[in-house]
Amino acid sequence: LFMIGFTGTTVTKDLASFLTASKPGGVIFFRRNLESVQQIVDLTNGLQKLSPAQPLLIAIDQEGGRVSRLPAEFTIFPPCGQLGQCNSSELAYSAAATIAKELRAVGINMNMAPVLDVNSNPDNPVIGDRAFGAAPELVGEMGSATIGGLQDNMVIACGKHFPGHGDTATDSHRELPVVD
């Protein structure tokens, strides 16, 4: 099962040809793919039409805070670190449920969230407020509630970047972190 990213905001002939030939299991959207509610609906519908036998996984990084790919028409959520400071699994569930409902409304069925790293290294350039906090118990409770809020509303959750990325001092987008 492959999941691919692509450039552009529409299903072009080249993209359609590639998807038809390669038959990926899914696509992931980034900011470069998303302009408006209607454009996202048109894009997801167009992509799904290319995969009539097996619905595509259509994924996004919609964590809240600085990792939010949807345009401004959607609800803006705080980073997970702020939710963690509230220490309310009910709030985490509710936020995730709302995110899921908005994603489903435009045809997105998978969220590359939540971040399940424990923010144990203040020098980490990537995790920071993307984590629910520095206590494993808090991260577990809030992460579990977030997964429930997404999945109870028909959006697949994908926990990340474990194991231990929160304890590194390396940007994993630039080099491979090592956890001792």
Regions found by a protein language model. Name each.
Residues 2, 57, 154:
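Short beta-strand/loop segments at the ligand-binding rim of alpha/beta enzyme cores
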Residues 1-11, 146:
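Boundary/entry segment of secreted carbohydrate-active catalytic domains
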Residues 141-145, 149-153, 159:
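Metal-dependent enolase-superfamily TIM-barrel catalytic cores that perform enediolate-based chemistry
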Residues 21-139, 161, 166-180:
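Enzymes and membrane/adaptor proteins characterized by extended Gly/Ser/Thr/Asp/Glu-rich
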